[in-house]
Every structure is written in C-alpha cells, then in structure tokens.
C-alpha cells in the first residue's frame, strides 16, 4: 500500500470527494476512487468519509492506494537522453515517436522499458506497468519528463503537480495567426463520447487550464509557448483546437495534413520542480529537436 496526501484549495470547495480526487494529476478514474472510498481507503482530516462528502478548503485528504497486480516489464537497453540524475529523480528528454509506458498491445520499446534497463530502482506507486512515471507526454510529442526513483520522490512530485507548482512549458506550432500576444484557456477536458480515443472540451470534464504566449508569427502559422497549469490528456492539443488554432501536423485534432511534419509540432522544452529531498527549485531546458527546428526555419523563410 502507498499513501498520497493532498490538500484541498479554495477553488475546490464543495466538490464531491470522488470528483475532487479524480481531477488530480494521478490519473485515477472516478469509479476507482468511489471503490476506494467504499473500502475506507480515503481519509479526510483523519476520518473516513462517504462518497457524497463535499470538500472544504484546507481539507487534508489521504488516499491509501492498493498495490497493483504484478506484471513483468521487460528491461530493454537503449540510448536515453538523460539531462539529470541522482538517487531520487531522473530527468529525460523523450524523442518524438516513443511511447512513455507499456500498455496492452505495446509492451516493448517504451521509455519505461529503457528506464528499467538503466535504473536499478524506480518508484512503484503508479504500478509495475508505469514504474517511476509521474506524468506523461504523448507518443509524438518530444521533450522533458521527470521520473521518480523511489516512493518518497514520487509522492513529492505528485503533490507538486496537484498543487500546481511544477513548471511545464511547451513550444508549439499552430495553424492560423493568433492576434493577441498572450492568453489563458480555461476549459474542462473529458473523453469524447463519440470517439473514446479522443479528448474534447466538455462541461462534465476535468478542470484544465493552459496559458499561452506568442513567440513568432509566420504567413499561416503561429509559434507559441504553452504553459500547463493542469495536465490533462492531450491538453494543449485539445485547448488550441478549441480556440481555433490546432497544432500543425496533429493527426487527431488538426486539419487534414497541410504541412510536412510527422505528428503534432509540440515539444516539452522546460521542466522545473522542487527537488524532493533538498527542496531546492531545479529547472531544465531541452532545445527543439532537429525536425521541429527545421519546420520553424522553413516557415520563417516562407514569411
């Protein structure tokens, strides 16, 4: 069993406990949370609660997460672009085209397979299919990920994500010309009822906030920096489509292919967090991958 501690904020006042926990960065489903509440594994301010409990600001919520079913993950030696590593955390620059963790039908060739060969220990809180994984980026998105090498680090990093103190900045190329230099997209994201493999903005979705800043404008495209306040599945891709500026090359949320680029033009370039052991803020920056830098240069040449 592993314990996760979460402090409720003012903006979460009066949310049901199951909705509150399902909206955190832990990728828990509401059904999963409801079962844990029923089993007495969710405690608020030291006492077990029922599923209809309404969150109050400052509530100290403790979730006891059961151990996952044991499954074997193959350790595969591979070249990893590691930016930082110590006894607690590892920061790796994931290439475009690599899946983060194994899943049914895709059990090898993932970042986790490579990490299992590189590290002797990784945290076990997220289960054996996702050891050490605190957050994810999509297969065709490149960039920085933080990995927990023990459960202490994992709990610290997850709590920082929940409390929105982790810096996550992405560089993206989007279709169209954004007229204003800065903006915030505050729109809940949930599973698309018509296509369960896609996400969409929906009233009953999870809270999602993205801030963006225009870096450069081209003839028919805009280069932007997007900063995540939350971390929903496909968040930047869904949010930019929602405001009318889908990512260039995005096969799922973009228009029909109008640009020569393999996958969405999105790179997780900046990652910052408080070190779990020392409390010191650390920040890392990964340059654009060659294919995305070339795309931007070509757009620049074309005006």
UniProtKB/Swiss-Prot annotation:
SUPFAM superfamilies: Alpha-L RNA-binding motif (SSF55174), Pseudouridine synthase (SSF55120). CDD domains: PseudoU_synth_RluA_like, S4. It comes from the Bacteria. It catalyses: a uridine in RNA = a pseudouridine in RNA. It is an enzyme of class 5 (isomerase). Its EC number is 5.4.99.-. Residues 15-74 form the S4 RNA-binding domain. The active site is at residue 138. GO terms for biological process: enzyme-directed rRNA pseudouridine synthesis. The keyword Electron transport does not apply. One of its GO terms (molecular function) is rRNA pseudouridine synthase activity. Keywords: Isomerase, RNA-binding. Belongs to the pseudouridine synthase RluA family. PANTHER family: MITOCHONDRIAL RNA PSEUDOURIDINE SYNTHASE (PTHR21600), RIBOSOMAL LARGE SUBUNIT PSEUDOURIDINE SYNTHASE D (PTHR21600:SF44). This is Uncharacterized RNA pseudouridine synthase YlyB. It comes from Bacillus subtilis (strain 168).
């Amino acid at each position: 069993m592993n314990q996760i501690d979460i402090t409720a904020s003012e903006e979460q006042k009066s949310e049901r406990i199951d909705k509150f926990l399902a909206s955190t960065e832990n990728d828990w489903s509401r059904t999963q949370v409801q079962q844990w509440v029923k089993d007495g594994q969710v405690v608020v301010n030291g006492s077990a609660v029922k599923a209809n409990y309404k969150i109050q600001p400052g509530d100290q919520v403790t979730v006891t997460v059961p151990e996952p079913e044991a499954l074997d993950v193959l350790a595969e030696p591979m070249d990893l672009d590691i930016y930082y590593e110590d006894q607690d955390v590892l920061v790796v620059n994931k290439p475009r085209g690599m899946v983060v963790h194994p899943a049914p039908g895709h059990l090898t060739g993932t970042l986790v397979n490579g990490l299992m060969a590189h590290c002797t220990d990784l945290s076990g809180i997220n289960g054996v299919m996702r050891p050490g994984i605190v957050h994810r980026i999509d297969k065709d998105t490149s960039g920085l990920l933080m990995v927990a090498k023990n459960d202490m680090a994992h709990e610290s990093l997850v709590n920082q994500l929940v409390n929105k103190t982790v810096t996550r900045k992405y560089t993206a190329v989007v279709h169209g010309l954004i007229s204003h230099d800065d903006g915030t997209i505050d729109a809940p994201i949930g599973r698309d009822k018509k296509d369960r493999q896609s996400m969409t903005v929906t009233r009953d979705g999870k809270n999602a906030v993205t801030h963006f800043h225009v870096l450069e404008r081209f003839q028919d495209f805009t280069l932007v920096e997007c900063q995540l306040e939350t971390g929903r599945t496909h968040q930047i891709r869904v949010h930019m489509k929602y405001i009318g500026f889908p990512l260039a090359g995005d096969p799922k949320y973009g228009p029909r292919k109008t640009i020569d680029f393999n996958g969405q033009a999105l790179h997780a370039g900046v990652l910052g967090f408080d070190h779990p052991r020392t409390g010191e803020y650390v920040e890392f920056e990964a340059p654009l991958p060659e294919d995305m830098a070339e795309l931007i240069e070509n757009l620049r040449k074309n005006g």
